[in-house]
Amino acid sequence: MSSLEGKSALVTGAGRGIGEATARKLAACGARVLVNDLDADVAEAVAASIPGAVAFPADLTDPAAADVVVGAALEAFGGLDIVVNNAGYIWHSAIHNMSDEQWDAMLDIHASAQFRILRAYGRWLRQNASADSPTRKVVNISSTMGVHGGATQLAYSAGKAAVVGITKTLAKEWGRFNVTVNAVAFGAIETRLTSPYEREPNISVVKGQQRKVGLSLEQIEAAKQASPLGRMGTPEDAANSIYLMCAPESDWITGEVILASGGVRS
């Protein structure tokens, strides 16, 4: 039997990159997966390619979206065993050039969106879970910048640091429901957020506005050299790290921040 056979999972930001790879990994290990993404076409395409998966596109920066997304997962599966809070993006700026809009946007998607998803899930848990329930899993995606900080990444780092606080607090609140809550803090992973914008500019549409995403070739090379392994991680590397926190073998691990950074420690 696959290790996640009979389990159900919600993965946010699952249309591309880490989220897509995670949805595929969990499904390959037996879980039924709800694929959430801002981009409806992408979410539908990913779900259609995963046996038994369900697509539910939604903009998680809409305060009303989280209740609807969690409700859709509960309706589709009759319960929810795994929540992976992955949705997010990067908006670079040094503090002297940072607008209130940039600050608010990074806190909104990385902290507030996770809070709302977990609040909705928590309301269901209080009615349906106990210490005798099968172990359920929450995995919140943070970043090494949320642990160590990062130049020109104040808002992003603050949002990802908030994820750490959310994780450690809910691990204490939800242990009595037999729910483990952990975070995975990634270093540089090869996604469109870290692809070279000199070669092919990547535009992400958020709330109807375009955001340029990506890194310079110089930044990409620096990220590779910072790792003792000499490379950036792949989405599959990231998904494997998340899977470990969803698997039965991690049932006694909670409240932890797992650094999956290729050995980068600053």
Annotated model-derived regions:
Residues S3, H148, S241-Y243, T254-S266:
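Short C-terminal tail/terminal secondary-structure segment
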Residues S3-L34:
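Canonical Rossmann dinucleotide-binding motif of NAD(H)/NADP(H)-dependent dehydrogenases/reductases
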Residues A94-I95, Q102-L107, K212, A223:
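Substrate-binding pocket helix/loop in short-chain dehydrogenase/reductase
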Residues L118, G159, T167:
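Active-site helix of classical SDR
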Residues R123, K172-E173, D251:
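Alpha-helical segment proximal to the catalytic Tyr-Lys
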Residues S143:
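Residue(s) in the substrate-gating loop at a strand-loop-helix junction
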Residues G175, T180, I253-G255:
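Short, small/polar-rich loop/turn modules that mediate ligand/substrate recognition or access, typified
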